[in-house]
Amino acid sequence: MKILVLSDSHSSMRFMRLCVSKVKPDVIVHLGDHFDDGEALNEEFPHIRFYQVAGNCDRYRTPPHAREILVMPIGGVRFYMTHGHIHHVKQVLSLLMRDAREAEADIALFGHTHMAYCERETDGLWVMNPGSCGYNRGSAGLIEIEAEKITSCRIDRRAHV
């Protein structure tokens, strides 16, 4: 299973479409800023499972069903998804990691900083920020799952995945 992770699109639809066309993911995750970009992408690719959370720039543009945190299994792996602003990820990652561990997540996904990051902690928790796919930064994350385990977790910063 391939999961495409996007964040901080800030109305940059072209790169997101390119990623979806190239990767052909089974699942798309959009981590906020801008929520309506995610909704538009979901409408363009309705056959692909889609999850998204709201970011700090989405305060006045999100529907009532929008969430700031989603915790759920995908492919047998437990995901903790948030934009990150409520965890103050520009200063520290410890609050995000604490909440992800309390939720018994296998991987924590966040955005907000526009800086790509992907590491596996000593206790096995994966932590990923795909960077910004907006502002011509061209950064995205790709997670691969086989047999209910993460087999690959990587960032691509070259405007294609």
Report each predicted region and the residues it spans:
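Charged helix-capping and loop-helix junction motifs
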Residues: 65-69, 91-99, 125
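Pre-active-site segment of Zn-dependent metallo-hydrolases
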Residues: 15-19, 81, 87-100
